[in-house]
Amino acid sequence: MRILIAEDETIIRLDLREMLEKAGFDVCAEAKDGEEAVTLARTLEPDLALLDVKMPKLDGIEAARRILEERPIPIVMVTAYGEAELVSRAVEAGVFGYLVKPFRESDLLPAIATARARHEELAALREEADSLTEALGQWRSASWLEPGHTREWTLTWRGTKLL
């Protein structure tokens, strides 16, 4: 798994890199500010990003929003700020995790695993919703073309909830 780190404090970036590489992850890039994080995410297409909240040029939450607009990946915020307003903004931006510094490797690795799992689950739900929308559109088209024509559909539990 290729991970992008965005953190304005050099020592924390180095600590994050060390923890991640020790756990077997590939740190594909390091950014010192939010703008650089967005650019690197666009060009390198990492599998996950760790972003600090308060960074120069562009804060981590806005950087997360921009990254997710272009390419949905799991994002975990790593920050010294745990205020409810910041957490709320991060959730609204679409991040999958929020870690308050200082943290240990035993905190970081589960946060990454959870973010990946939630991202994969959301992707599967979106794919199923798209498939159901397409099937429903085909069914409606067929029923309009052939009056009285019906089709039998078998839906999963998730599918019934989406309808």
For the regions a language model picked out, list residue spans one by one.
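Active-site residues of response regulator receiver
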Residues: 52, 79
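Active-site beta3 strand of CheY-like receiver
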Residues: 44-50
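Receiver (REC) domain active-site loop signature in two-component systems and cognate sites
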Residues: 55
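Two-component/phosphorelay signaling modules centered on CheY-like receiver
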Residues: 9-29, 33, 43
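Acidic catalytic/metal-coordinating carboxylates
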Residues: 33-36, 59-62
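C-terminal output helix
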Residues: 85, 103-113
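C-terminal output/effector regions of signal-responsive regulators
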Residues: 123, 127-163
